[in-house]
Amino acid sequence: MANISLILSDLDGTLFHNDKTISYFTKQIIANIQKNGILFGISTSRAKINAEKFLNGITPDVFITNGGGMVFYKNKKIYNCEFSVQEVNTLINATFEVFGKDVIISADNEYGLYSNSKEELGDKFWTYDDFLNFKQPCMKLCIQSLDKEKITKVAESLDASAIDFLPFSDIPWYKLSKKDATKEKAITALCDYLKLSPKKIAAFGDDFNDIGMLKLCGKGIAMQNAIDEVKQVADEICLSNEEDGVAKKIIQLLEPIA
């Protein structure tokens, strides 16, 4: 059995099937390792409220949300890295200036999810906002575009060197967050809090913002469906998200307790 104290998994493209469900088999494996003293955690770009609704019976010990903007351990918030109200307004104004008034924006923080797209209104977790008078701090601002040059101009409205901006591989959006709001920074804060070496963590991921996490942790595992950049830094590659790759790799790592 590997010397692992914590399993961390991304959600979309990793723990989730493509339809955003988690199999009963995977839930049972997670419950088994938790009963045997192994911590299980989620590490996702989603806001906490937008992740919990899909877990259905899974109770993570660790919750890293907003791409690393916030960390919870046993439901206690232990790390927070967000844009101030003024910084959010500067970025939003720059987004409208660079892309025009019809650009689609989303923002999220500890308390909610906000979008100026009315397509989100069918989801009770989203709140419509035109962002013309938005007065809340946020961990993450997302812009519907893959134009890196324009996204860079938006980031430069603050200090581009202090902003992390990455595309999503599966949707035409960019995510902007503070430089320290990354999964690897969040894990470092968690390890400091728990007095735990990252070498005792196994992490699963599939997308750009999982790269730092997989490189930091003792065992970085890419999904078979991961982008090539993630596979290149991973220690191992497991089965795809559709094949319950996370759960099956946990069994291999933690036999006989999984």
Q: PLM features: residue spans?
A:
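Asp-based, Mg2+/Mn2+-dependent phosphohydrolase catalytic module
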Residues: 216, 221-258
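Short active-site oxyanion
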Residues: 37-41, 59-61, 139-141, 199-200, ...
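Short, structured coil segments at secondary-structure junctions
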Residues: 58-59, 67, 158-161, 216-217, ...
